[in-house]
Amino acid sequence: MSIIEIIVLALIQGFTEFLPISSSAHLILPSQILGWEDQGLAFDVAVHVGTLIAVVIYFRKEVSSILSAWFKSFGAQGSTDDSKLGWWIILGTIPAAILGLLLKDMIELYLRSAWVIAVTTIIFGLLLWYADAKGKQIKTIYQLNWKTALIIGLAQAVAMIPGTSRSGITMTAGLMLGMNKQSAARFSFLLAIPIISMMGLYYTVELALGDHLVDWSTLLLGVVLSFLSAYVCIYMFLKVIERMGMLPFVIYRLLLGVGLIVFLTL
């Protein structure tokens, strides 16, 4: 890859991983539309590591509190709001982890296309708009229960389809289940930590067992740029939804989806 491609793809991953607009779609499109070469497995791992570091650092207080309470819940302290949240994050991760392993190859073979991205971008954009407009938005993150967490986890599994958006579909589910915007977003971000970690570990093992050439300077640049852009993105996103809701991202998804359809039919 050229230096321009490295910079663009790393920034795309960072900026889109936590926005409800689908990072996978934005990484697939340059190769499908611009003819760029595939970024390769090692680069995929690098940019996911960057975004993982960003979300862990941004939510470091919450992560520390949840982990501490979760481990202490096995002892005399018993169950607390934070320990329960830890269990809900684990429960919400299971569907995507299982289905990801089972369906990964089939999805990559049949669904990694610009047409699929165009359609899913529009459909799930409209669902996000509906959830934002019609959801009661009264529940906080600590009012989750196991049923809510499992439903959001099942929604996260749907995000394996390119164009869906992991953060978008989990926030949509959270809003439809009555969560307020900040809580739906924060749970979505916390839910990203184990799933991105497992994805990174899976691909790292695949990378180690395979015959892949590794350019460490490229990987380091990918980690740094995706980390910086993801951190800024999380901060800005939480500010935007507080003032404007999900509408800007719905509009973007609709414009992108329609634009892709027009482009593909010309």
Curated annotation (Swiss-Prot):
Catalytic activity from the UniProt record: di-trans,octa-cis-undecaprenyl diphosphate + H2O = di-trans,octa-cis-undecaprenyl phosphate + phosphate + H(+)
Main location: membrane
Enzyme class: hydrolase
TM spans (from-to): 1-21, 39-59, 83-103, 113-133, 141-161, 189-209, 218-238, 244-264
InterPro entries: UppP
EC number: 3.6.1.27
GO CC annotations, alphabetized: plasma membrane
Cellular localisation: Cell inner membrane
MF GO annotations: undecaprenyl-diphosphatase activity
Anything else known: Bacitracin is thought to be involved in the inhibition of peptidoglycan synthesis by sequestering undecaprenyl diphosphate, thereby reducing the pool of lipid carrier available.
NCBIfam families: PRK00281.2-4, undec_PP_bacA
Similarity field: Belongs to the UppP family.
Protein name: Undecaprenyl-diphosphatase 1
Organism the protein comes from: Pseudoalteromonas translucida (strain TAC 125)
Gene this chain is encoded by: uppP1
